[in-house]
Amino acid sequence: MPLPSRGPAAHPDPRNRPHRRLHARTLTVLDQVVRPAAYSRRALTRQLKHLGLLADDGPDRHRAEEALLIVGELVGNACRHSSGPTLMTSQWHPRTRRLTLAVSDPSPGVPRRKAPDERGEGGGYGVLLIDILAGHWNTVRHGDGGKAVVVTLDFPPPPADPPTPPQQSR
């Protein structure tokens, strides 16, 4: 019986594998991080690249970039409006091509849409942005008084393989 190879074929590039075969769930603890929104975007970027969803010319890149915008907004708001540990969870569901993002914090406050700050100081666009980009989002209360904001993003079906041209007989 031959031993497994240690060459490149033994560890194929995960971006070349079909999405339906990959599973990923990531939990990121953000309470000890200097720039939690940026850190969460980097963590999600690594996961999306591993899944092949952020390929330079891939069909999923645009939706994956929207996920990065959303997670940065969720984490930024959680850190701005609460004190205590903030957690980000992301999970890819390959069969349904759905990405679930959840950001938990100890604050009981629920995100709500407010008028954007027109003075140029920023703020007020987070919930509007999530409403526009997310397929679905809601708030789940925890028993300890905190909450998680959960966002679901549907990715488009993968492109169909081009039809095989008929072979000509000779």
Where are these regions (language model features)?
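Conserved beta-strand-loop-beta-strand hairpin that lines the nucleotide-binding pocket
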Residues: 1-32, 79-170
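Short beta-to-alpha transition helix within the HATPase_c
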Residues: 25-46
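Short, structured helix-loop boundary elements
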Residues: 37, 41, 60-64, 127
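Conserved terminal C-lobe alpha helix of the protein kinase catalytic domain
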Residues: 38-41, 45, 68, 72, ...
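Solvent-exposed, charged/polar functional surfaces in cytosolic regulatory/catalytic domains
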Residues: 43-50, 136
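Conserved short strand/loop->alpha-helix "switch" segment adjacent to the catalytic nucleotide/phosphoryl-transfer site
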Residues: 48-72
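Metal-dependent amide/peptide-bond hydrolase catalytic core
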Residues: 75
